[in-house]
Amino acid sequence: EQSGDINRGVEREDPYNQGAGDQGMMFGYATNETENYMPLALDLSHSLLWELAEIRKNENDLMPYLRPDAKSQVTIEYDDNGKPLRIDTIVVSTQHDEFITAKGITQEEADLAMQKKIAEDVKSILIPRVKAQYPAHVQALFNDDIIYHVNPTGKFVIGGPHGDTGLTDRK
C-alpha cells in the first residue's frame, strides 16, 4: 500500500495538476564524462545519496532528522556537442523524522518549517560537500540558477517497504 505522504503528491483535485506518481524511467550507458564511466547526472545523483547516508550515519548532528530512505535525480543541460553546460535541476527526497509541533503553532506550520529547514540544509550542507568531491570543471556546473526540488511532495516520514511497495508488494 502506498503511504499517504506519497499519495498526496499524486492525487489532486485539478486533473491538469495530477501527479505522475513516484515513478521514473531511468537508463544508463557508459560514457567518458566521469572516471567511473557513469553519466555525470547519475554520478552526481549517487554522490548526493551517498553523502546523505554519510551524514545520517556518521555526522548526525548536521541533519539529525534524516532517516534511511532517499532518492535523487540530477538534470544537466548540455551544448550541441554534448558538453555539460550547467546543472539545471536537483531533486532530493529524503525520509525524515516526524515534525514536532512547538507550542502555539499548528501541525501544518510545523510541517512547513521543517520542510524549509530540510531544503536549507540540502543547499547549505549537502550540496557543498558533494560539490567538493568533484574536479573544477564539474564544480563550475553548480551555480545560483539551479532549480531545487527538496521533498517536493512534502512530508516524507513513512519510508522503505512500509511507504511504497508498488504493485508487486516489493521495494
Question: Model-predicted segments: where are they?
Answer:
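Compositionally biased, intrinsically disordered low-complexity regions
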Residues: 11, 165-168
